[in-house]
């Protein structure tokens, strides 16, 4: 049975479960919400780790309890300590005012440390001390603030392997991994693909004021794809299909994915033709998104779920092949 699980938050995120594997994830999350222990959520990029973290928070605390998330990989090492622990005015050059860190902001609620596997060993040692002592001290201060938080850590890495390789502290691993939750990649829970795709289709039909359906060949293409980018990639593909579909039906070529029929036929010519159609669909989609964002490459990259550098590379490649870049 398909379930639509409200993961809360201002963005109204929904996690859709249909497979046994995804139902198990939320069954475990529901049980963990009853106990104030650290939780480690692992899984590939785009599998929905932040959504599960928010679900645990919403089923643990009252609606007004703080929920604070930090992406450890997105903050430079020299700023992460100040961001997490806070600082007093004059603690370092540029500290013109005092700043409460993320631990303080999350006190009485949940702190999500996303991509904790990217944290340096030196920063791991400082984090471990805060977790052991259950108190935090701002940079430039001698006053300790007692903490009462639920820590959730998330990573796309195998932390046990990172421990073995000496890149992650074993004592910190045991501290944060009291109960681990693993979210399987989308390719290992294919029963979830079409329910998620149809939910996203309804979402973007409303956004783009279009009424389209997924053709049988499009559904088969979705099921056959391995989804290295998981749900995030699936969302981009569905958006692309809604935008590029001619008429009231999304075909496999609109998604930029090879059709089952094309995959089954032998011969390099057929494979080359499928790839060319996929590339053309991708170019059309990128051009359309760039146009919607009035040529703003930073916003376009964020919408596509790629880095600005990757977008620049794709745009350069498209120009070399003579693609229409009217969105510039």
Where are these predicted regions, by residue range?
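Base-recognition residues in the alpha-helical recognition helix of bacterial helix-turn-helix
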Residues: 125, 129, 137, 308, ...
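Conserved post-Walker A coupling segment in P-loop NTPases
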Residues: 14, 28-93, 104-120, 185-190, ...
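Nucleotide-binding/hydrolysis machinery
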Residues: 1-23, 33-34, 60-65, 140-150, ...
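Short gly/ser/thr-rich secondary-structure transition/capping motifs
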Residues: 90-97, 133-138, 161, 292
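AAA+/SF3 P-loop NTPase mechanochemical coupling elements
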Residues: 68, 95-108, 112, 120-126, ...
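Conserved RecA-like P-loop NTPase ATPase core
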Residues: 25, 47, 70, 84, ...
């Amino acid at each position: 049975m398909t379930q639509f699980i409200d993961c809360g938050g201002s963005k109204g995120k929904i996690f859709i479960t249909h497979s046994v594997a995804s139902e198990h994830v939320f069954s475990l999350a529901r049980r963990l919400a009853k106990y104030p222990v650290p939780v480690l959520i692992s899984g590939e990029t785009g599998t929905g780790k932040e959504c599960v973290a928010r679900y645990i928070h919403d089923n643990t605390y009252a609606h007004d309890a703080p929920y604070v998330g930090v992406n450890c990989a997105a903050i430079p090492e020299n700023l992460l300590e100040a961001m997490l622990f806070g600082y007093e005015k004059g603690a370092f050059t540029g500290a013109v005012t005092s700043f409460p860190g993320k631990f303080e902001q999350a006190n009485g609620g949940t702190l999500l440390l996303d991509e904790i596997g990217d944290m340096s060993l030196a920063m791991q040692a400082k984090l471990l001390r805060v977790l052991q002592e259950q108190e935090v001290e701002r940079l430039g201060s001698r006053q300790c603030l007692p903490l009462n938080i639920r820590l959730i850590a998330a990573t796309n890495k195998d932390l046990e392997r990172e421990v073995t390789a000496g890149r992650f502290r074993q004592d910190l691993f045991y501290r944060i991994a009291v109960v681990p939750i693993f979210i399987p990649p989308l390719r290992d829970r294919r029963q979830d693909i079409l329910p998620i795709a149809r939910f996203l289709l309804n979402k973007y039909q409303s956004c783009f004021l279009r009424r389209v359906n997924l053709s049988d060949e499009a559904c088969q293409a979705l099921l056959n794809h391995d989804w290295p980018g998981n749900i995030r990639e699936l969302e981009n593909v569905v958006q692309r299909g809604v935008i590029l579909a001619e008429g009231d039906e999304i075909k496999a070529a609109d998604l930029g994915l090879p059709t089952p029929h094309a995959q089954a036929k032998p011969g390099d010519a057929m494979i080359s033709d499928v790839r060319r159609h996929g590339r053309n669909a991708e170019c059309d989609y990128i051009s359309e998104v760039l146009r919607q964002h009035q040529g703003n490459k930073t916003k376009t990259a964020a919408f596509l779920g790629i880095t600005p550098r990757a977008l620049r590379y794709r745009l350069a490649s498209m120009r070399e092949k003579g693609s229409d870049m009217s969105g510039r």
